[in-house]
């Protein structure tokens, strides 16, 4: 029963990891697209700069920065998953050694 629980845990960890990688990839693409749009818009407005436009762009870039903060959290989650898998590998190696 414990082995089956461990197997389900590994499966869930794998699913969680894949989903996290997908979310990171999706978020990176989204942020890249938004940053590209902002830079293109900024270039278009170089000749027509106004304080209002600058403030709007600053707020949008702050949004991009918030998105990057989210990405940092995702990478921290990935690091935690790595630590969990390392710990599991050590326990598995220990269990295998005990069985020999």
UniProtKB/Swiss-Prot annotation:
Q: Report whether Cytoplasm shows up as a keyword of the record.
A: yes
Provide the primary localization: cytoplasm
Q: Note whether Iron-sulfur occurs among the keywords.
A: no
Q: Where in the cell is it found?
A: Cytoplasm
Q: Provide the alphabetized UniProt keywords.
A: Coiled coil, Cytoplasm, Transport
Q: Which InterPro entries match?
A: CNL1
GO cellular component terms given for this protein: BLOC-1 complex; endosome
Q: Name one GO biological process term.
A: regulation of protein localization
- Residues folding into a coiled coil are 25-46
Q: What does this protein do?
A: Component of the biogenesis of lysosome-related organelles complex-1 (BLOC-1), a complex that is involved in endosomal cargo sorting.
Q: What family is this?
A: Belongs to the BLOC1S4 family.
How does the annotation summarize its subunit structure?
A: Component of the biogenesis of lysosome-related organelles complex-1 (BLOC-1).
Protein's name in the database? Biogenesis of lysosome-related organelles complex 1 subunit CNL1
